């Protein structure tokens, strides 16, 4: 096993522990708490994949961080902070919409890279909007927290989320997953649009009809693989 993979996991475990202690003191905001819950699932998945105990990894990560801090000067810290782009949290959904349980009469599931796509294939002839909560850096989508598909009546009929065992994804992964979800829902004569906020940060533009500017290759994939793959 690559030593960098192990040490990265160890550092992530310790940093999660620090953030959890901070949250336990009721000092974290909603995006901070969302990341803690998401990262906890990710760490559990990585622990199983790597075969490494989380508690032992947390202790090892603490030693790595302590060594780095001992070698870090205040000036170097200022330079590193200045070079990192500031992320911000964008919310299409309310906390209630994010946390609400939902059920599928005809469940369908597909994996697109590190993202899981779920939809209810019993949904017919509905007007559907895709809404998401995500982080943004340099005015582009950075990390998808959660995407859900809502009917005009407010029912949840689809979702895109991260796989805990495969952390990390790109904006292209998100756009591909959205294309698959749209294709699956449109197969049953539903009309699907993407929120203007999500269009703007994922594609850099927004259309009034709610249809993102998918590349021709992706349009062909949406049209030709939905029935067999989703």
Swiss-Prot record:
Q: Where in the cell is it found?
A: Host nucleus; Host cytoplasm
Keyword annotations for this protein, in alphabetical order, are: Eukaryotic host gene expression shutoff by virus, Host cytoplasm, Host gene expression shutoff by virus, Host mRNA suppression by virus, Host nucleus, Host-virus interaction, Inhibition of host innate immune response by virus, Inhibition of host interferon signaling pathway by virus, Inhibition of host PKR by virus, Inhibition of host pre-mRNA processing by virus, Inhibition of host RIG-I by virus, Inhibition of host RLR pathway by virus, Interferon antiviral system evasion, RNA-binding, Ubl conjugation, Viral immunoevasion
Instruction: Offer one example of a GO biological process linked to this entry.
Output: symbiont-mediated suppression of host mRNA processing
**For the region RNA-binding and homodimerization, what residue ranges are annotated?**
1-73
Query: Any keyword RNA-binding?
Result: yes
According to the record, the residues making up region (CPSF4-binding) are 180-215
Organism domain of life = Viruses
| Region PABPN1-binding: start-end pairs | 223-230
GO MF: protein serine/threonine kinase inhibitor activity; RNA binding
Sequence segments annotated as region (Disordered): 204-230
The record's account of how the chain is modified after translation:
Upon interferon induction, ISGylated via host HERC5; this results in the impairment of NS1 interaction with RNA targets due to its inability to form homodimers and to interact with host EIF2AK2/PKR.
- Write down the InterPro entries for this protein, in alphabetical order: NS1, NS1A, NS1A_effect_dom-like_sf, uS15_NS1_RNA-bd_sf
- Assign the protein's first listed, main location to one coarse class: host cell
Q: Identify the residue span(s) of motif Nuclear export signal.
A: 137-146
Matches recorded under Pfam families: Flu_NS1
Q: Please provide, in alphabetical order, the Gene Ontology terms of the cellular component aspect for this entry.
A: host cell cytoplasm; host cell nucleus
Pinpoint motif Nuclear localization signal by residue range.
34-38
- Does the keyword Glycoprotein feature in the UniProt annotation? no
**Entry note about domains:** The dsRNA-binding region is required for suppression of RNA silencing.
Its biological purpose: Inhibits post-transcriptional processing of cellular pre-mRNA, by binding and inhibiting two cellular proteins that are required for the 3'-end processing of cellular pre-mRNAs: the 30 kDa cleavage and polyadenylation specificity factor/CPSF4 and the poly(A)-binding protein 2/PABPN1. In turn, unprocessed 3' end pre-mRNAs accumulate in the host nucleus and are no longer exported to the cytoplasm. Cellular protein synthesis is thereby shut off very early after virus infection.
On assembly, the entry states:
Homodimer. Interacts with host TRIM25 (via coiled coil); this interaction specifically inhibits TRIM25 multimerization and TRIM25-mediated RIGI CARD ubiquitination. Interacts with human EIF2AK2/PKR, CPSF4, IVNS1ABP and PABPN1.
- Per the similarity annotation, which family is this? Belongs to the influenza A viruses NS1 family.
Which HAMAP family does the entry mention? INFV_NS1
Q: What is this protein called?
A: Non-structural protein 1
Q: Source species, please?
A: Influenza A virus (strain A/Gull/Maryland/1824/1978 H13N6)
Q: Which gene encodes it?
A: NS
């Amino acid at each position: 096993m690559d030593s960098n993979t192990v040490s990265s996991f160890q550092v992530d475990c310790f940093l999660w522990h620090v953030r959890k202690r901070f949250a336990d003191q009721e000092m974290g905001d909603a995006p901070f708490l969302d990341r803690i819950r998401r990262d906890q699932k990710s760490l559990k998945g990585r622990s199983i994949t790597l075969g490494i105990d989380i508690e032992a990894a947390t202790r090892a990560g603490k030693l790595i961080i302590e060594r780095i801090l001992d070698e870090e000067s205040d000036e170097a810290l200022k330079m590193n902070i200045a070079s990192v782009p500031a992320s911000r949290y964008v919310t299409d959904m309310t906390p209630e919409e994010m946390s609400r349980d939902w059920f599928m009469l005809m469940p369908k599931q597909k994996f697109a890279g590190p993202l899981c796509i779920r939809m209810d294939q019993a949904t017919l002839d509905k007007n559907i909007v895709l809404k998401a909560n995500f982080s943004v850096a340099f005015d582009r989508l950075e990390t998808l927290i959660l995407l859900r598909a809502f009917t005009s009546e407010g029912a949840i009929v689809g979702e895109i989320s991260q796989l805990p065992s495969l952390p990390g994804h790109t904006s292209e992964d998100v756009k591909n997953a959205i294309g698959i979800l749209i294709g699956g829902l449109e197969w049953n004569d539903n009309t699907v649009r993407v929120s203007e906020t999500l269009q703007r940060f994922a594609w850099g533009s927004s259309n009034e009809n709610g249809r993102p500017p998918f590349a021709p290759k992706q349009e062909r994939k949406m049209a030709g693989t939905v029935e067999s793959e989703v």
